[in-house]
Structures are given as C-alpha cells and as structure tokens.
Amino acid sequence: MRMKEDAMKNGQLKPGYNVQVGNENTFAIGYDIFADAADMRTLPVHIDNVQKRLEHTFEMVIADAGYGSEENYEYLERNGSVALVKYGSYHQQRKKSFKKKIFNSENWDYDSEQKAYTCPAGNRVPYVKTVTKETKNGYTHTIDLYQCHSCEGCSLREKCTKAKEGRTVQRNEKWLAQKKQVNERLDKEENKKIMKRRSVECETVFGQIKGNQHFRRFHVRGTEKVRVEIGLLLMGYNIKNLMRKEQEKKAA
C-alpha cells in the first residue's frame, strides 16, 4: 500500500498494514489490522468486531471524512448508531466558492416531478436510465443517469463537457439524502463540540505512539504477530494514560 511517508515522492508501494483504533475518552477500546489501505472499507468490520468484543452497541460513531460513504452511513443506521461522520467533499461543498461553480450539477436546478435538470445554458437534461454499481465490499449503488441532448452548438459546451455524446449527470438519491442528513446533524452546536473533541482524542493515540514513542514500523511479520505487537503498544498507552489521569486527580 502507499504510505504517508514517501521520501522518493513517487507514490511507491510498500508492504504494510492499516491499523484501525477505536477510542473513548482518550482510551483505546478496540483495534483491528487490515491489508486494505482504504479506511472507508474497514469501518463496518472494525465496528462489528469491537462491538462483539465489548458486547455493546455504540449509540454514536464519530469518524473523519475518510470514512464517509453511502455504504457506511447505511451500515451505521442499520446498526442503530448515530453517525457523526463527514463525507469527503463536506468542507468543499460548504464553501461559498462551491456555489459559484455553475458547471457542477449539484448547483443546477432540478425538477423532481419531470426528473430533469436545467443546465447553465438553460437546456433540459432529462433522465435516461438507472444503473447499479457494486463496490469491492459487495454493496450496490443505485444511480440515475441524465443526459443533455442540446449540447451540439452550445456556446458553453467547452466549459461544461468534453464528452462527444454531450453532458451526462449521475444522481444518487440515497447519497444526496444521506449528505443532507449529515449536514443537518453536524450543524447542531452539541455535535460541533463533539467533533472538536474527536479531533483531539483520536489523534492523541497515534500521536503518542508514532510521535512521542517513535514507533514508525512493526518489528514482526504476519497479521497475527502484528496484531499482538500493536495490542501491547495500545495496552501500554492505556496504562500510561490511566496513570496520568490518576496523578491529575491527586494534584487537583
């Protein structure tokens, strides 16, 4: 997999493991090792494993934008967990500059009854067909396709599309509804405070292990051996964390 540390700056592939750690109040409460570099695909498995070990279902799951996807939002809803998880374009889409991008179909007028968009040139972009796409995890996306039939001779075509057949638009109703729900949820003041706390708590675990303890690579090979090594590291982290909190209580 590709590492964050890339001295040659050429995106070279290196053998490695994707470590997922769940934490609560700065303590590590569960971890998993994956050969998959994509954090997004690890969330359901990681949550299931930690819940099974703890015999507890999480009422709320908080994660960064690397975990936000249609599949994960649906999984968390099915799990009975409130998702405080941003999606990849969350911050970008909330900027004023994003609303000014007239060629982005998310800024176009949409007629739900007629099932058609209106493009920047004022032309209709009607519904054509529905297709499905399957992820590596076997999850199926349902996507509606729209296509403009008035691109020929349009003065805005060069800025709008380079496709020979004209501008096409993909619309995923479930994904749009999920993003709207996420936006509304994250706009609540109490949830803003929780998200700020998340950035501190989650980064503390890896910050301590990688930054302060200078642990940058595993000393063993094989998933099971790596699982033991990271488990010992996290156990040590939790013990030190508990001792620090006890000392702070005594000092207070």
Identify the meaning behind each predicted range:
Residues M1-A252:
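Anion-binding and metal-coordination hotspots
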